[in-house]
Amino acid sequence: MIEALDEAIASWRTGRAEAADYDALVHRARRRFASLVAVPPDRVAVGNQVSTFTGLVAAALPDGARVLAAEEDFTSVLFPFLAHADRGVRVQTVPLDRLVESIRPGVSLVALSAVQSADGRLVPGGLDALASAAAAHGCLTYVDATQAVGWLPFDAGRFDFVSCAAYKWLVSPRGTAFGVVRPERLELLRPLFPGWYAGEDPWTSIYGAPLRLAKDARRLDISPAWLAWAGTVPALDLLEEVGIAAIHRHDLGLANKLRERLGLPRGDSAIVTVSADGGLERFRGGDIRASVRAGAVRLSFHLHNTESDVDAVARALGV
């Protein structure tokens, strides 16, 4: 990825960059992501962040709609819905372990992160149970898959709307993201940011009326930050080459080795959280990158990590 970015920046700096080359990269990234989440490419829109896609879904809800969400979920999942309070959109939050059982008649949409950003928790009972409960009650589903896609097998076709920022587990530059829409739900979403790149043929949609948007999810595309996409493509290529099943085994295996060292029960997440006592200083000597989220230290294991990293964390924690 770094080499691809360096090459793209060099081409840009020297004036050798061609717009059509970047366009090909975006199309390739769309296809790669579609493959990773098991949907056709025509269901995938490209963008730059999760909250943009959440905002499209929030704007599509009717006045007075009721949204069900998990307590303390990432705000890019919550804020866009809360911003519609002036037209009666209500957001009810419940503990994650009660989310599925709280889906009932009257809920317009359930919104959640597939994996919780703060502590790595997955919804109890699994996403299949959530999708089934929502379908049984005629409830739409919106899933932010940012903390899932790249290590956790994920079928985006189970949900009405999905978003995913690529800079986390897709190991891509910040500023690239994807949205997935079921074909039968596409008409619910008004393109709020339509520009030339959302056109049926972007290169003939640069000037003038009438409106001529793509017929598929590309109608929701946001004009891409080309250099960021130059780094996203090789990252997605690598993930597809290694395979999500193998990455899942690797990442979860390392996370559970750390849990075992810490005397914690085995888990189902590649994210491990430990007490924030002592802050991050105890990790700096071991060249360990960690974050403090929601009062705990968050540690994540991915394809570049090895058992030596587990040992380094254990030493830093004194176990």
Question: Could you say what each language-model-derived stretch is?
Answer:
Residues M1-V319:
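Pyridoxal 5′-phosphate
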